[in-house]
Design a protein with these regions (language model features):
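N-terminal secretory signal peptides that target proteins for export/translocation
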Residues: 1-24
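Bacterial N-terminal signal peptides
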Residues: 28-40
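A short beta-strand motif characteristic of beta-propeller blades
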Residues: 46-52, 88-95, 146-153, 192-204, ...
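Beta-rich, blade/repeat-based domains predominating
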Residues: 53-69, 96-121, 153-171, 199-220, ...
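Conserved beta-strand positions in repeat-built beta-propeller and related beta-rich domains
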Residues: 54, 70-75, 108, 114-131, ...
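Short loop/turn segments that connect beta-strands within beta-propeller blades
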Residues: 83-87, 141-146, 185-189, 234-239, ...
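Asp-box/WD-like beta-propeller blade repeats and closely related beta-sheet repeat scaffolds
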Residues: 130-168
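Beta-propeller blade signature
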Residues: 132-142, 325-336
Length: 337
């Protein structure tokens, strides 16, 4: 009972923190919760947006090389799947394997796995499915959707945000409310606190770790949402090395999801932009690809197209709560500009 009360207090604190972030992030009209990005490599292209269920508030999107898209739901939970040219259909049922609200999702084709960040966000005023407490990394079979594993983030304050997978099959997980990056080695029974650093800690009234990606150089890169920053975490023999803040060529606004894009990265900025980030040494060149996006939260690459999830989260936890958010889509953006 005492543990449950502690979880409830932490959930409420997270809710207040998110409300504060809403006001600071996008004023009275927008909110972008920290989201995941995933990489796919096929040349499949589609010009029309892909619809997802009404009032599902997509919080993350990922893909496979054939152009299949997977999107999680912030409020309903579960994961929907859309084959190239097809409609979104339920793939992971809400509440499956004890899951709650779905944040980051990542398809790992090499390992045949779908990673899902599951969180109890009742403190945000969003009950979601089920009654599991805390933050979890859920793992499902990418082909069948069958549950493959469930791994709790150990800190009761944790918020499982996003996932990256290294060349050895290890999964890295960002935690928005602690200064920790967790690691799940292949075959491991639990997550380990892989990297912890004061630079990664959430600022007062801010939101910490968000996007996460393994770069072409083999190092790990992460974003923090408020204040918006980029960091490199060196990887040597599988262990975390130095944490370095990168100097950006322009100011970035609410740095959200990030994933590898060739030798660079794709970055979602919560204020409505998709950008390309190229790192050289301790500096990062930031070039805008698209702007004017409606509360974007995630992106995944399929060939020359970036599929952006416009989460419109202000309509469920922000200043637009109670208003009609309109239809939800995954929006295609050309990456050849």
């Amino acid at each position: 009972m005492n543990q449950e009360r502690s979880v409830t207090r932490n959930s409420l604190a997270q809710g207040e923190l998110l409300k504060s972030r809403s006001a600071r992030a996008l004023g009275t009209t927008g909110l972008a919760l920290m989201l995941g990005v995933a990489l796919g490599g096929a040349a499949f292209a589609q010009s029309a947006p892909v619809g997802v269920p009404d009032k599902s508030f997509p919080e993350s999107v990922t893909s496979t090389k054939d152009g299949t898209l997977y999107a999680g739901s912030f409020n309903l939970g579960g994961v929907v799947k859309a084959s190239p040219g097809g409609k979104a259909e339920q793939f992971i049922q809400p509440g499956a394997a004890g899951s709650r609200s779905t944040l980051g999702v990542l398809a790992d084709e090499k390992g045949g796995l779908l990673y899902v960040c599951s969180n109890d966000i009742t403190g945000f005023g969003v009950p979601g499915p089920g009654d599991t407490k805390g933050a979890w990394l859920k793992v499902f079979d990418l082909a069948s959707g069958a549950p493959k594993g469930s791994y709790g983030l150990p800190d009761p304050k944790s918020l499982c945000n996003d996932i990256a997978v290294g060349s050895d099959g290890s999964a890295y997980v960002s935690d928005s409310f602690t200064p920790n990056v967790y690691k799940l080695k292949p075959g491991a029974a639990a997550l380990e606190a892989w990297a912890t650093d004061p630079l990664l800690a959430p600022a007062k009234d801010g939101v910490g770790l968000d996007g996460i990606a393994v770069g072409a150089d083999g190092n790990l890169y992460v974003t923090t949402f408020i204040p918006a920053k980029l960091f490199k975490i060196a990887i040597k023999d599988g262990k975390a090395g130095a944490v370095t803040e990168l100097k950006t060529s322009r100011a970035i606004d609410h740095a959200d999801a990030m994933r590898a894009f060739g030798d660079s990265f794709l970055l979602i900025e919560g204020a409505g932009r998709l950008a390309k980030v190229t790192v050289k040494g301790d500096e990062a060149q930031v070039d805008t690809i698209a702007e004017g996006l409606a509360e974007p939260v995630s992106v995944t690459q399929v060939g020359n197209t970036g599929w952006v999830a416009e989460g419109k989260l202000s309509y469920i936890i922000g200043d637009n709560k109670g208003k009609d958010p309109g239809p939800f889509t995954l929006k295609p953006v050309s990456l050849t500009k």
